[in-house]
């Protein structure tokens, strides 16, 4: 198990990961979902328009999912995680997965905060490439808590899932 912490006066962030030994299971590999095909990009949701910072570090391409139970967006990181080193597909995917609560948002961000307090990622294979899609949906309970779940894709197919606990507050 690997654990890394970002510390200032206190722990600001913690990453815990199991480093698993891999073996060849090519002959029995299967995907739960068919690959997602990127369509024409739709406008970024109005509530997120003009928001800079983190959003400037990604090419965000929402998809038309009218009438479907989950929202879909494709992403490509546009900024380096470390200026001098190119990011691996796994590192780029980690930056994208943080967006799931925005992709699956069911609340107006002008009226509500819905901060993800954690992110859990389960991969069934390593991602490839630089473009990743999230198919995300959120649920909000009656007590200020919620959850966003997402299926994660690269351009070749399903990669894994994520879950985020949401802290929901009125603005």
Question: Model-found features: residue ranges?
Answer:
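Terminal targeting signals and extreme-terminal segments of soluble enzymes
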Residues: 1-171
